[in-house]
Structure formats: C-alpha cells, structure tokens
Amino acid sequence: MSSYDVIEYWNKRDNPNSKNPNERNTLKHISFVKENIRLNDKILDYGPGIGRILPAYTENNKVTGYDVSSKYKERLLETAKQRKIELNLIIDKAILTEFSFNNNEFDAVVSISVLLHQPPKDIVNIMCELARVATKVVIVSWHNPTIPYDSSDVRPDDSKFCFNHDYKEICKENNLKIDSWQYDNEAKQIYFVYRHD
C-alpha cells in the first residue's frame, strides 16, 4: 500500500485489536460506552469491525452498524447473534462524509478506535455528521499531545495509519460541545463525549 486508502487498509488488516494491551483496553472501552448509553437507546456503531464493543449493548438497544469493509461481516454478525443483539449492518464501500441518516435519528453514536484512522481532510466532516445524526457521540481514540496534530504514526511496513487529531479544536471551531473528556496517558487514548451545541 503506497498511499493511505481507508477501505484498502481495513480490507487488508487481519485480526484487528488482537494484542494483549488491546484486550485490556477493550474492557475500559466497554465500560465507558455503558456509562454513556441508556437501556433503550437507538445506537449507531460507527466502525463496529469485529464487534468487540457489542458487550456494551443490551438486547433492548436498537443497534445499526456502519462500516466501510465487509471483511469482518460474518464474525460481527455471529457475535451479535450470540449476544442476542439485533444488529442492522450497513456496509458502504465509499468513504462518506455525509450520511443519509436523519438529524438526531440516533440517541448515540459510538465510535471506538475509528476516528484515528480517518485522514485529516475528512475528520471535520465526519465528526460534524456524527453529531448531526445523534443527540450525542461517544468516542475513544488514540491521542498523543506530544506530536503535531494531523500527523500520522506510520510504521515502515505501512501496516498502521493513525492520525493525531486535535479533537478539542475541531469541536470548538464547529459548534460541537464536549460534555466529558478523559485522557488515559498510559494507553495514549482520549475518552470523550460531544454533541451539537
């Protein structure tokens, strides 16, 4: 992969989030999501991948998954079935910075370890659209305040593309209100909830 293509990246990535630190972090992610959704919430899971966040949801939640890759579709649907979660999965192979959902169609958008993979040219539109379609947006993302914003963390083998976005500034400049903000220095992850102001 000579340049970064989000869809190609996910179609080629095997066993995402399978290393030990990610297993430990997943429990923190699930807990954070549970703290920020209600029993009967209608949820948009933006980038559900293999379904590692599904344990945060209950049978009563109405969950729509939105992903750009079908690589993990069967694994995701099987996990949802095992957890008795009715999941409406939308696979859209075009990178959309404008969604077809209605304003406030969802009670919450949940997006865990997804925004960090969105290129700087798309991040503002994506964050604004997520806030448009739900009353609140629940995010966990890689964040390293010691490196320049909108730079990427790229290994020589091109197996990882992570962008360090200035989420506070994006929210400020786009009338998005941050309701909670927590930083995990050890994991270099930000946990935050935002909405339209």
Regions found by a protein language model. Name each.
Residues 1-40, 46-98, 118-125, 129, ...:
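Class I (Rossmann-like) S-adenosyl-L-methionine-dependent methyltransferase catalytic domain
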Residues 38, 104, 132-133:
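Structured loop/turn residues at beta-strand edges in well-structured enzyme cores
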Residues 110:
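A conserved beta-strand element that flanks and buttresses the S-adenosyl-L-methionine
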Residues 134-138:
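Short glycine-dipeptide loop
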